[in-house]
Curated annotation (Swiss-Prot):
Its EC number is 4.1.2.50. It comes from Buchnera aphidicola subsp. Schizaphis graminum (strain Sg). Keywords: Lyase, Metal-binding, Queuosine biosynthesis, Zinc. Belongs to the PTPS family. QueD subfamily. Catalyzes the conversion of 7,8-dihydroneopterin triphosphate (H2NTP) to 6-carboxy-5,6,7,8-tetrahydropterin (CPH4) and acetaldehyde. This is 6-carboxy-5,6,7,8-tetrahydropterin synthase. Zn(2+) binds at H15, H30, H32. It comes from the Bacteria.
Length: 120
């Protein structure tokens, strides 16, 4: 039986979406308090009783966080069109090699809108 654990992060960043219609509100420069949830799935280690130390998750995500927090996302290579979907995929490809049991990334731009990415 496998268990899913999660660690949440939040970062502030500005962006705009260059490929939406000119009059669309997301075409203008704006910012968000982005919410990121990393979900990891594995068997519970019988010896220590956990899947992974939460500190290891934070350590693996820290360089990505530093690249995103208080930055203009469109200037980051690979995020020229920084939709929630593309951002989730971008994070996945940087984090999965460090956290092989990464199962899901959830991105929320607002409290009502977001993306769930499972990196198949």
């Amino acid at each position: 039986m496998k268990t899913i654990i999660f660690k949440d992060f939040q970062f502030e960043a500005a962006h705009y979406l260059p490929y939406v219609p000119k009059m669309h509100k997301c075409r203008r420069l704006h910012g968000h308090s982005f919410f990121v949830r990393l979900e990891l799935k594995d068997k519970i280690n019988e010896k220590n009783g956990w899947i992974i130390d939460y500190a290891e998750i934070k350590l693996a995500f820290q360089p990505i966080y530093d690249q995103l927090d208080h930055h203009f996302l469109n200037d980051i290579p690979g995020l020229e069109n920084p939709t929630s979907e593309i951002l989730a995929k971008w994070i996945w490809h940087r984090l999965k090699p460090k956290l092989s049991i990464l199962n899901t990334i959830i991105i929320k731009e607002t409290c009502t809108s977001g993306c769930i990415y499972q990196g198949f």
